[in-house]
From Swiss-Prot:
<feature type="region of interest" description="Disordered">
    <location>
        <begin position="24"/>
        <end position="192"/>
    </location>
</feature>
<feature type="compositionally biased region" description="Basic and acidic residues">
    <location>
        <begin position="279"/>
        <end position="290"/>
    </location>
</feature>
<dbReference type="GO" id="GO:0005934">
    <property type="term" value="C:cellular bud tip"/>
</dbReference>
<keyword id="KW-0597">Phosphoprotein</keyword>
<dbReference type="GO" id="GO:0005737">
    <property type="term" value="C:cytoplasm"/>
</dbReference>
<feature type="modified residue" description="Phosphoserine">
    <location>
        <position position="43"/>
    </location>
</feature>
<feature type="domain" description="LIM zinc-binding 1">
    <location>
        <begin position="556"/>
        <end position="612"/>
    </location>
</feature>
<dbReference type="GO" id="GO:0005094">
    <property type="term" value="F:Rho GDP-dissociation inhibitor activity"/>
</dbReference>
<dbReference type="GO" id="GO:0005933">
    <property type="term" value="C:cellular bud"/>
</dbReference>
<feature type="compositionally biased region" description="Polar residues">
    <location>
        <begin position="35"/>
        <end position="64"/>
    </location>
</feature>
<feature type="compositionally biased region" description="Polar residues">
    <location>
        <begin position="296"/>
        <end position="308"/>
    </location>
</feature>
<dbReference type="GO" id="GO:0030427">
    <property type="term" value="C:site of polarized growth"/>
</dbReference>
<protein>
    <recommendedName>
        <fullName>Paxillin-like protein 1</fullName>
    </recommendedName>
</protein>
<keyword id="KW-0479">Metal-binding</keyword>
<dbReference type="GO" id="GO:0046872">
    <property type="term" value="F:metal ion binding"/>
</dbReference>
<feature type="compositionally biased region" description="Basic and acidic residues">
    <location>
        <begin position="130"/>
        <end position="150"/>
    </location>
</feature>
<dbReference type="GO" id="GO:0005935">
    <property type="term" value="C:cellular bud neck"/>
</dbReference>
Length: 706
């Protein structure tokens, strides 16, 4: 029981059995190998001689590619097969078939090397030992040999041009003697697909540095063949270019730069050169004779003539002609437009109308446009007659100038009420077929209000009607004569809201004069701002809401300048908004500067001294005339007292509830006989004074100013 509970849960280890280690269980190969076998360096990827190195356990290299043994065919053809079979049986790695062409070159080993062994380790050892001895004697020997062979190869390029001779000479100059390949092998290597060739290059680069150098020397012949072919192509292209240059020179010499009369006849534009003066003359002759524009829709599409082409081709010569044509065309357009509307014009009106029509009128008037203009004119006539009925004070009708086009776009004139903000300009009228409307409009016009330079007859600006605007007359009426007309004018005015009065101040001023004549209850604020009327007035204008900056922000509230340096502001958000310069922080009533001895009182977001604060706040005691701060008593007449100051005159008790005022000045509590006091009086006066005694009741409440 003891061992089964507290013992080891694992079975006991058998000493006769060899258990796998952690590396073996993980899959690593921990078996010892031949110490003379080639090992791959993980950092450089090159083969190093392992003769003098101690036996190392072989591990799997994940990053490096599997090494492929190099088979030598020429010197040991029989042993290469056995080596291949041994490699196949030992590591189960088959060399790729692509490497057959690249590995057929054999190396003639030095005399000291031994190729009797069939293991690939002996091959790598025989290859690496001469390179080690050569690198120990002279480390730069291989590079100097390559430079010398490159020079010899460059010198022999001109002498022997056949690829076979080049390959033979390059192979003799290399430090390693390689066997020559067959013609079939070279053709087979050249016929490789790009994918197989890239795979061959990758596998060659992945092998050891010595084998890589051997492969580079093997590929030297192929490179020489390619270079020879490229050189032949370059020489042929140079010869072709030289022949082409000679042909170009011959072509240039054969060119004839003399003028050809046939070519000139084909290229010149005879209508432009011959007809241009005539076309210009015809344009000058025909422009003043433009007929009147017909009211049709077909005339809207302009036609492209030869004159327009001439103006585009010759802009400098035809510029003056264009100006003259503009000046000559504009009267024609104006005359046609006025003829459609049957208007009679002066010379001055004709001149103004031509300018406006040339600027504003782009298309001629159609029949539908004419009907719309007549309808607008009738509506304007109705509005003018309505305004004439409202004009009971002798206000004259005035029109807006043609240049003030922004007023013509609006339909505010249809409302029938005058707009006083528009300046008074020239006097015009709309000519209608009916003479009654014309007479009714011209009767109300005052000659003193019409400008002298205004046109005598009515005109239209491009067919649109001119709208009448009103000017407020400055005629003052007496109390007897003017009140009747003002009363009638007042009854006809509708009720206008306060938002409308902000945009129509002249109507407000007129209403103010009427109210001032009747009552003097209205008053003006001290700052000269908005006017307030009495409670029975029909119009009241509210004060505009001023923007308030947070405490410590915005310009100085006293001078309006930016606050730099020392500033004064309230640390509480609900006390004072904005900020001041230190020297500008004063009482708004007396101008005394605030400091440690002069406190600041805040009332209505304004700073006051103590005296003016209590005057504005009505917090001065009526008994002692001192300032009230804290609790106080207030009666129904908004009179305030200190709690200790309001006492009964007779018994000297403090009054906290309702009390009485005897003869308008003496406070009395409710504990006394009021009827006896009315008859006898307080000082026991004679009965003759009984009729003069008065008594009134006051109600009080307790308030706190804190």
């Amino acid at each position: 029981m003891y061992n089964s509970i507290y013992g080891s849960p694992f079975p006991k280890i058998n000493p006769k059995v060899r258990y796998k280690t952690a590396l073996e269980r993980a899959g690593f190969d921990t078996k010892p190998r031949n110490p003379f076998s080639s090992q791959r360096n993980a950092s450089t990827g090159s083969l190093q001689a392992s003769v003098k190195s101690p036996p190392i356990t072989r591990q799997r290299n994940v990053s490096a590619a599997p090494s492929v043994p190099v088979t030598m065919k020429s010197a040991y053809t029989a042993s290469s097969k056995s080596a291949y079979s041994s490699v196949k049986g030992e590591s189960d790695i088959y060399p790729p078939p692509v490497l057959e062409n690249s590995e057929r070159r054999s190396v003639t080993p030095p005399k000291n090397s031994n190729f009797t062994s069939s293991r690939p380790s002996d091959i790598s050892r025989s290859i690496s030992r001469p390179s080690e001895r050569a690198s120990q004697e002279d480390p730069f020997r291989f590079e100097r040999d390559l430079d010398r062979q490159a020079e010899q190869y460059a010198a022999s390029r001109h002498t022997c041009k056949s690829p076979a001779n080049k390959e033979f000479q390059a192979a003799d100059n290399f430090p390693f003697n390689f066997e020559q390949e067959d013609a079939g092998n070279t053709e087979r290597e050249q016929d490789l697909s790009p994918i197989e060739r890239s795979f061959m290059m990758l596998t060659q680069n992945d092998t050891a540095s010595v084998v890589n150098s051997m492969n580079q020397t093997d590929n030297r012949g192929v490179l020489d063949q390619k270079l020879g072919k490229e050189q032949q192509k370059e020489e042929s292209s140079i010869e072709y270019e030289s022949e082409g240059q000679q042909e170009d020179e011959n072509d240039i010499e054969s060119l004839n730069f003399e003028p050809d009369p046939k070519l000139q006849m084909n290229l010149e534009n005879e209508p432009l050169q011959d007809d241009f003066p005539e076309a210009k003359q015809e344009e000058k002759n025909t422009e003043p004779k433009i007929p009147e524009i017909n009211v049709t829709r077909e005339s809207n599409t302009p036609s492209l003539t030869m004159n327009a082409l001439d103006s585009k081709i010759y802009p400098d010569d035809n510029f003056s002609g264009l100006e003259s044509s503009k000046e000559q065309k504009s009267p024609g357009v104006s005359s046609s437009s006025t003829k459609v509307e049957d208007l009679s014009l002066d010379g001055l009106n004709e001149k103004r109308l031509s300018i406006t029509s040339s600027e504003n009128v782009e298309t001629p008037y159609t029949a539908t446009n004419l009907q719309v203009e007549q309808l607008i004119a009738q509506l304007d006539d109705v509005s003018l007659s309505r305004n004439a009925k409202l004009d009971m004070n002798g206000n004259c009708l005035n029109a807006v100038d043609r240049k003030a086009s922004r007023f013509k776009k609006s339909s505010a004139y249809l409302s029938g009420y005058p707009s006083m903000d528009i300046p008074v300009t020239q006097q015009t009228s709309i000519v209608q077929n009916s003479n009654t409307n014309l007479s009714r409009q011209t009767i109300l016009v005052d000659k003193g209000d019409v400008d002298e330079d205004a046109p005598s007859e009515s005109t239209t600006n491009g067919g649109t009607p001119i709208f009448y605007k009103f000017k407020q007359s400055n005629v003052e009426y007496s109390n007897n004569e003017g009140m009747g007309s003002q009363e009638t004018f007042r009854t006809k005015l509708p009720t206008i809201e306060a938002l409308q009065l902000q945009h129509k101040r002249n109507i407000t001023d007129l209403r103010e004069e009427i109210d001032n004549s009747k009552s003097n209850d209205s008053h003006v604020l001290p700052n000269g701002g908005t006017t307030r009327y009495s409670s029975d007035a029909d119009y009241k204008e509210t004060e505009p809401i001023e923007f308030k900056y947070p405490p410590g922000e915005g310009p100085c509230r006293a001078c309006g300048l930016e606050v730099t340096g020392k500033r004064m502001f309230s640390k509480k958000e609900n006390e004072l908004s904005g900020q001041w310069h230190r020297e500008c922080f004063k009482c708004i009533e007396c101008g005394i500067k605030f400091n440690k001895h002069v406190p600041c009182y805040i009332l209505g977001d304004e700073p006051y001294c103590q005296k003016h604060y209590h005057e504005e706040n009505h917090s001065i005691c009526k008994v002692c005339s001192n300032f009230i701060e804290g609790e106080c008593l207030e009666n129904d007449k908004v009179e305030r007292f200190h709690v200790d100051c309001l006492n009964c005159f007779l018994c000297k008790t403090a009054i906290t509830n309702d009390y009485y005022i005897f003869n308008g000045e003496i406070p009395l509590c409710g504990n006394h006989d009021m009827e006896a006091l009315l008859k006898e009086g307080i000082d026991n006066a004679t009965s003759s004074n009984d009729k003069n005694n008065t008594l009134s009741k006051r109600r009080t409440r307790l308030i706190n100013f804190n």
